[in-house]
């Protein structure tokens, strides 16, 4: 995404990197000691490893930092491509490794630790909120009416657990694997 929030179709920065890419794991393990790991967990509610977007970005893109305009998960990129809005939800934000669960925003200290400018990260909104209407390009691509609401959405594991158990009390759902 460039500075005008337009898709850069002719100059990708590289191939998409998904959560299964573990090349940054050993590097992140060396960079984060036990005390830091406990502090990251306290602040984010998530264990930290090289598959989270913040360490992955630092590991893979540190030489090309000046070229990067936005950092998005695959879901967030799809939402952007369909609506033009750069937005994520809290469950996906947790996968960035810098989302503070107490104040529900990007944690500036964790962003600084990984060398991330918070301005590169998407806005955070609730998952069941419309991100916007389907844009003309998305309408043509999908054969759907322009303007239909596109929701912010949530992480697949969160949606799967919700679909299995709903919001009912006394219900257990187990998600294993991917």
Spans of model-derived segments:
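Glycine-rich phosphate-binding/catalytic subdomain of phosphoryl-transfer
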Residues: 1-178
